[in-house]
Amino acid sequence: MRVSRFNPRNRGFTLIELMIVVAIIGILAAIAIPNFIKFQARSKQSEAKTNLKALYTAQKSFFSEKDRYSDFANEIGFAPERGNRYGYRVSAAAGDCEVRNAADLPVPAAGVPCISNDSFRFGANSAIDDPTPVVARFVPQGAAGWNTTLGVQPTIADCPNCNFFAGARGNADNEATFDDWVIAGFEGSGQVGPCSEAGNVASGTPYNTRNDVACDGAAQ
């Protein structure tokens, strides 16, 4: 008996079937790739949270020895590892930032109120000249009357009846806008906005005043 060479089980895909498969893959990629990019950006935000907690611990340790806080990173021993995507603002006091744009960093001749992001590692175009975060969405709470002035408040002369407020600014997604964080030695609350979430913020807890990952291009 003659057997047909055209066994239905051996037939290939038709052009329409291939086009459907390609379309499905394209749809899945359109959904998955942006989510993956956002996941990567959120993982970069962990640097800011980790280093701000280290800054908080450094201030508390310094206070336990000196009965005061400090406006300067080098005085409290706050020095994030190289390769930092975020810059850090300890205070708004006079002085130059530690600019990380070279392999070797000069020994500071005075107090260092801020530390830049590592533009030597990420390139000159990544440099953040001023790592001062937006602070409008963080509201101090309690009867002590603390505010959002970066540094020791009211002044160092008021210590030990003093407190501190600090922050960070970076670029988590390599786009034009910044990702901003703050940390305080006092209680506060976050206010809902285009780029921020509402909620109580405990002392020593980093708060994302402008979430660059969640709202590219939106005004704060």
From Swiss-Prot:
Major place of residence: other
Location in the cell: Fimbrium; Membrane
Under what conditions is it induced? By the two-component system PilR/PilS component PilR. In the contrary, PilS is a negative regulator of pilA expression. In addition, an increased level of c-di-GMP correlates with reduced transcription of the pilA gene. Expression of pilA seems to be negatively regulated by the accumulation of pilin at a cell end.
Q: How is the protein's activity regulated, according to its record?
A: The two-component PilS2/PilR2 is required for proper assembly of T4P and regulation.
Q: Which residues form the propeptide?
A: 1-12
Q: Which domain of life is it from?
A: Bacteria
Q: Name one GO cellular component term.
A: membrane
Q: Which family does it belong to?
A: Belongs to the N-Me-Phe pilin family.
> Please, what other remarks does the record include?
Pilin assembly limits pilus production and S motility. This limitation could be linked to the high frequency of reversal of gliding direction observed in M.xanthus. Reversal implies loss of pili at the leading pole of the cell and commissioning of new pili assembly at the other pole.
What name has this protein been given in UniProt?
Answer: Type IV major pilin protein PilA
* Natural source organism: Myxococcus xanthus (strain DK1622)
